[in-house]
UniProtKB/Swiss-Prot annotation:
UniProt-annotated location(s): Cytoplasm
PANTHER family linked to this entry: ACETYL-COENZYME A CARBOXYLASE CARBOXYL TRANSFERASE SUBUNIT ALPHA, ACETYL-COENZYME A CARBOXYLASE CARBOXYL TRANSFERASE SUBUNIT ALPHA, CHLOROPLASTIC
GO molecular function annotations of the record: acetyl-CoA carboxylase activity; ATP binding; carboxyl- or carbamoyltransferase activity
InterPro entries per record: Acetyl_CoA_COase_a_su, ClpP/crotonase-like_dom_sf, COA_CT_C
Protein name: Acetyl-coenzyme A carboxylase carboxyl transferase subunit alpha
Name of the gene this protein is made from: accA
Pathway: Lipid metabolism; malonyl-CoA biosynthesis; malonyl-CoA from acetyl-CoA: step 1/1
One of the record's GO cellular component terms: acetyl-CoA carboxylase complex
Major site of localization recorded for this protein: cytoplasm
Keyword Lipid metabolism among UniProt keywords: yes
UniProt-listed Enzyme Commission number(s): 2.1.3.15
Function of the protein: Component of the acetyl coenzyme A carboxylase (ACC) complex. First, biotin carboxylase catalyzes the carboxylation of biotin on its carrier protein (BCCP) and then the CO(2) group is transferred by the carboxyltransferase to acetyl-CoA to form malonyl-CoA.
All copies of domain CoA carboxyltransferase C-terminal, residue ranges: 42-295
């Protein structure tokens, strides 16, 4: 992924000021000034400030981090983890959907089916991928690929990053709710192991449709919820400005969801979030995925499906 000019969130202002000071000093050093000790001192101060800040993020701040425009996306993880990736297109019923990436490749030498939502990173790509909000044909494409992988005994990896399924009129006319339900059903019926990773946002049924997996992992600063904080605030308080309060009450964070048993693993992010060191985050995620598939490898197909179904039934009974 390209190294764009760093974008700071509102709450990162203290770190932004220190980084700006470091850049100024480096410019002076380039002109021959010997200020290496001062630069080192401020760099240490910036690292400490960043560590303290990210160790105490509120749920709303984590939501902002999960949406960071420079956070690595689905295609970045595919590029970093998958070899011989061959994308497949179309749902064989209506059209293709660029919001839902799908195909086959190799993960650490073994065949894998990859399904994931792509938000895009530029204006052009965001429009192309519809900001990661899949339409019915995207979920039907996912079902087609899951069925294909299941027939050939190929493991499935889901990379989740969406604000939710697309709520447009056309999507509703083409059966958005049914498509999401069928995709969730397809996940539950798989006899091959599937692993899901919440990379950034896990928005409602749009995320669950490909995240109903044997193992569900979340990045440390990702969020996963039935509704966005802004949406919940608008419904509960008729005031979208109460999003911060809504985020706290929704329990959207990986830490909350791990405590409730909804997800299995929290993947630690580099200091300052995944967007500050995408390569490191992608490598960490790859190691966790490999471990999850290794743990599931000894299970026979019937047990793989039974354990997955029982897992989600238990969540419903425990929290319902």
């Amino acid at each position: 992924m390209a190294d764009p000019i760093r974008s700071y969130l509102d709450f990162e202002k203290p770190v932004a000021e220190l980084d700006s000071k470091i850049d100024e000093l480096r410019a002076l050093a380039a002109n021959g000034s010997d200020i290496s000790e001062e630069i080192s001192r401020i760099e240490d101060k910036a690292k400490a400030a960043l560590h303290e800040l990210y160790a105490n993020l509120t749920p709303w701040q984590k939501t902002q981090v999960a949406r960071h425009p420079q956070r690595p996306h689905c295609i970045d993880y595919i590029a970093g983890l998958i070899t011989e990736f061959t994308p497949l297109a179309g749902d064989r019923k209506f059209s293709d959907d660029d919001a839902m990436i799908g195909g086959f490749g190799r993960f650490r030498g073994e065949s894998v089916c990859i399904i994931g939502q792509e938000k895009g990173s530029t204006t052009e790509s965001r429009l192309k991928h519809n900001f990661g909000m899949a339409r019915p044909e995207g979920y039907r494409k996912a079902v087609r690929l899951m069925d294909m992988a299941d027939r050939f005994g190929i493991r499935i990896l889901s990379l989740v990053d969406t604000a939710g399924a697309y709520p447009g009129i056309g999507a509703e006319e083409r059966g958005q709710a049914e498509a999401i339900a069928r995709s969730t059903e397809a996940c539950l019926n798989l006899t091959v192991p599937n692993v899901a990773v919440i990379l950034g946002e896990g928005g409602s049924g749009g995320a669950i449709a490909i995240a109903t997996a044997n193992r569900v992992m979340m990045l440390e600063h990702a969020v996963y919820s039935v509704i966005s904080p802004e949406g919940a605030a608008s419904i509960l308080w008729r005031d979208a400005t109460k999003a911060q309060e809504a985020a706290t009450n929704l329990k959207v964070t990986a830490q909350d969801l791990a405590r409730f048993g909804i997800i299995d693993t929290v993947l630690k992010e580099p200091p300052g979030g995944a967007h500050r060191d995408p390569a490191d985050m992608i490598a960490r995620t790859g190691d966790a995925i490999a471990q999850a598939f290794s743990d599931l490898a000894p299970l026979d197909p019937k047990t793989v499906r039974t354990q997955r179904r029982q897992k989600f039934l238990d969540i419903g009974r425990r929290l319902g």
